[in-house]
Amino acid sequence: MIKTAVATFLNRHLQPSSPLEPAHFTITNGCSSAVEHIAWAIANPGDAFLLGRPYYNTFVPDLVLRTGFNYYKRAFEKAAMGCQRVAGLIVSNPNNRLGRCYSRASLLNLMTFFSENDMYFISDEIYALSAWENEVDRGLEPAPFTSCLSLTSTDLTPDRIHTIWSMSKDFGANGLRIGAIISQSNPSLHKALVAVALYSSPSSASNHIAANILEDEKWSDMFIQTNRSRLADRYGLVARWANTHGITYTAGANAAFFLWADLGSAWKRHNSGTIKDEDLDDFLMKLFLEHKVYVSSGKEFGSESVGWFRIVFSQDESQLLTGLERVSLLH
């Protein structure tokens, strides 16, 4: 029931190059279990997975906590020189931190590279239906969302390409615990996961509720459109706040509910002191918490520069404004 509902729903929304069927799915209790299961199936202890920075920080325990894999190498060549096998790459598309989508060309290039080198490409598309129109950052043309399921090329090895999706973000349903591993050309993967997926199966109640939601096309379409509209509105609110306060942020977001902002530089511009760069994130994090506002530090996500923080803007407008005001007071 749940596999059929998810397949039918995603066929409508992700435009796969070939129709999704129930046999193409392994259902899990969320994307974390899905990531861990795929890693277990395609890699061996000591193997490495590549992650782009900044990355979704929970990928790290998902990949390594129980498997013994290495989660990050700065470059493929570095791993190769160390005689270490790279099992594959995992990407968040849309990106979980920057709120941007990979372009069609970028996805094809990545998928082709990993196919040619006998490695796996894993696309986490948990924000697939949370793309919206950016009407604030003028002059930029963000790439629209493209699912890797919609791409095809003679250069690709389909059995090495896996997709992950969940209702947790697009439907604001973290507690429902419904996730999916999608692999159209690798039945051996699904067969291998039968035993381990036994420990991460959603409840019958979750399956029933999720199927009812996904099968109600009129309601689900309305919900998705309303969500997109509200996310676009909230992004505009936060982006204008950042511009008003001279806070640099990564412009061009058009998906999910994040604004990647350089709060560190803004703080240093208005505060003289002796805070070392390596201590800046922890210092600001402590300061924010003292003023009862939580903003995730880029340090947690492998940020390549200090002082960057992730602002989540999917709250009620009054709560969001209160949080932004508290951040503003610290600058």
Task: Report each predicted region and the residues it spans.
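PLP-dependent class I/II
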Residues: 1, 5-331
